[in-house]
Amino acid sequence: MTMTSLDIILFISAIVFLSIYYYNLFSNAKRSNGLKLPPGPKGYPVLGNLPQLGAKPHQALQAFSRVYGPLMRLRLGSVDLVVASSPSVAAQFLKNDSNFCARPPNSGAEHMAFNYHDLVFAPYGPRWRLLRKLSAVHLLGPKALDDNQNVREEELAVLARMLYERSRGGEPVNVGKEMHVCSTNALSRAMMGRRVFEKLAVGGGGVEEEEEMKKAEEFKDMVVEVMTLAGVFNIGDFVPWLKPFDIQGVVRKMKRVHRRYNVFLDKFIAECRSSAKPGANDLLSVLIGQRGKSDGSGGEITDTAIKALVLNLLTAGTDTSSSTIEWALTELIRHPDILKKAQQEIDSAVGRDRLVTESDVPKLPYLQAIVKENFRMHPATPLSLPRMSIEECDIGGYHIPKNSTLFVNIWAMGRDPSIWPDPMEFRPSRFLPGGQGEHLEVRGNHFELMPFGAGRRICAGTSMGIRVVHSTVATLIHAFDWKLPEGLTAEKIDMEEAFGISLQKAIPLMAHPIPRLAPKAYSPKMK
C-alpha cells in the first residue's frame, strides 16, 4: 500500500503538531516547579538546542559559556544537558561524583560497544568495577606498565627504524598513521601477546608489507570512524520517538562499522588464543580464564564482554594517544625554537648514540612541560565523556534535575583567558618552575588541566597515556628533525579540528623525518 501526497502531508502535519504540543507540555512542566535552573540559550521546539551545536559542539558550547557563564543548561530534545566550563564548577560536580558516575543511554554504546557490555559505557556498579580491576592489574596499573615497558620501547624502536628507512625515499610520512600503527602494536602485544601488524614490524618492504600497510590504514579508518560516530549528537538519543527513523543515518553507520570491527575482533582474538603460551598472564588470557564466572551483577563474563573490552582498549587506547602525539609534533614544527630547546635537553641527558627510554623522561622537565601544554591546547577528549545525574541535586546555587546529562568542556577550560594568559599561544614555560602551572599535573586532581577527566570514571588508561605520549614525543624529536613538504610553511599548517570523542586533526600532518642520531641507534633488537 502506497501513501498519497495528501497522506504524507497529513502525516507530517500530525508529527509537527504533536511535537510542538509535547515540547510545550514538557517545557511548561519544567518551568512550573519554581526551581532555579542554570541559565542557557533558548532552543527550538522538539529539538531544543541540538541544531545550535553544529559540527564542533565543544566550540559552540564554549561560545555559549561566554554568554551564560561557566554553568549552563541546554535542552537537547527531552534531555537536560548541563555543561561545566570552569575548573571551580567542574570540581563541584567531580570531587564528590557519586551522583554523576552513571552514563546516559546512547546509540554508540548500544550499537558499537556490544550493547553496554564494554568498560567505558557500562553502568556503574560491580560489573564495571570488575572490568576496571582486571584492566588495571593486567594492563593499565603501575606494575603491569612496568612489566610491559620493554614492549613499548621495542615498538618505538621499530617506529624509529621505519622512519629512518622511509627518510631515504624522499616522501613525507603521514605522522598520525605511523603513530597509530606503533600504538596498536604496542598495546596489542601487552594486552594479547602479539602484534596486530606483524609484517610492518618485521619490515623489509615487498608486497606483503604493502598489503599490511593497507590493512593498517583500513584499521585506523575504522577506529577513527568509531570514535567519530560515538561523538555524534544523535537526534534519536534525545527525541526518543524519532529514534526509529534514524534521521541522520548515524545508527546505520554505527551498525556497519560494528560489523566490520566484530569480524576483526573474532579473527584476531582467535589467532591470539591459538598462539597463546601456557600460563600466559596477559589481559586477554586472564579474561578467557574468567569466562562463565560471575560478573558481580547477576550475569557472567562472556565472549561478548571480552570483545567489548578489547574494542574499548584497542580503540580508545590507540586513537587518543596517536592523535595527541600528532598534535604535539605539529605544534613543535610550528615553533622551531621550542623544538630546538627540547632537542638540546634530550641530547644533554641521553646523547645521540641511543634512543630515549621511559626512564629518561623524569630527567626531561622541558619535554614534560611541552606535553602538558599540548594537553592544555589539544586534549584528547574535548568534552568529557557524558555522565548522568542519578538524583536531583544543587550545584552552585542551581537545581540540577534527575537524569541530567553532564559535560565538562575540557577544551574550553584549556583556552580560557581568565585561567591561561594568551591561551592561543603554545608556551610550555607555563609549566616550568615559576610558571603559573608548575604545580599542575594531569591525573584528575587539578581541574585546570584534566585531559583524562577526573573522579570515579577518569580514563582507565591515564597512566599508560602519560607514559606513551611522553616517550613517543621524545623519540620523534630526539631521533629526527622534521621538514614540511615542498611549498608548505609552518605558518600555513592546517590546524582545523575534526570533532569526535577524540579530537583529530582535520588534515593529517605530513612531514619528512630527517635522522639526527648515530646510525646504530636505529637498529632495534626485535622480538
UniProtKB/Swiss-Prot annotation:
Broad enzyme group: oxidoreductase
Tissue and organ expression note: Expressed in young cromes.
Any single GO BP term: flavonoid biosynthetic process
InterPro entries given in the database record: Cyt_P450 (IPR001128), Cyt_P450_CS (IPR017972), Cyt_P450_E_grp-I (IPR002401), Cyt_P450_sf (IPR036396)
Cystine pairs: none
Ribosomal protein keyword on record: no
Residues binding heme: 459
EC number, UniProt record: 1.14.14.81
Cofactor: heme
Gene Ontology terms: cellular component: membrane
GO molecular function (one): heme binding
Known pathway: Flavonoid metabolism
Location(s), subcellular: Membrane
Pfam families per UniProt: p450
Keyword annotations from UniProtKB, A to Z: Flavonoid biosynthesis, Heme, Iron, Membrane, Metal-binding, Monooxygenase, NADP, Oxidoreductase, Transmembrane, Transmembrane helix
Catalytic activity: a 3',5'-unsubstituted flavanone + 2 reduced [NADPH--hemoprotein reductase] + 2 O2 = a 3',5'-dihydroxyflavanone + 2 oxidized [NADPH--hemoprotein reductase] + 2 H2O + 2 H(+); (2S)-naringenin + 2 reduced [NADPH--hemoprotein reductase] + 2 O2 = (2S)-dihydrotricetin + 2 oxidized [NADPH--hemoprotein reductase] + 2 H2O + 2 H(+); (2R,3R)-dihydrokaempferol + 2 reduced [NADPH--hemoprotein reductase] + 2 O2 = (2R,3R)-dihydromyricetin + 2 oxidized [NADPH--hemoprotein reductase] + 2 H2O + 2 H(+); kaempferol + 2 reduced [NADPH--hemoprotein reductase] + 2 O2 = myricetin + 2 oxidized [NADPH--hemoprotein reductase] + 2 H2O + 2 H(+)
Transmembrane segments: 6-26
Keyword set includes Metal-binding: yes
SUPFAM superfamilies, per the entry: Cytochrome P450 (SSF48264)
Topology class, membrane: Single-pass membrane protein
Function of the protein: Flavonoid 3',5'-hydroxylase that catalyzes the 3'- and 5'-hydroxylation of flavanones, dihydroflavonols and flavonols. Converts narigenin to dihydrotricetin, dihydrokaempferol to dihydromyricetin and kaempferol to myricetin.
Protein family: Belongs to the cytochrome P450 family.
Identification of the protein by name: Flavonoid 3',5'-hydroxylase CYP75B138
Organism from which the protein derives: Crocosmia x crocosmiiflora
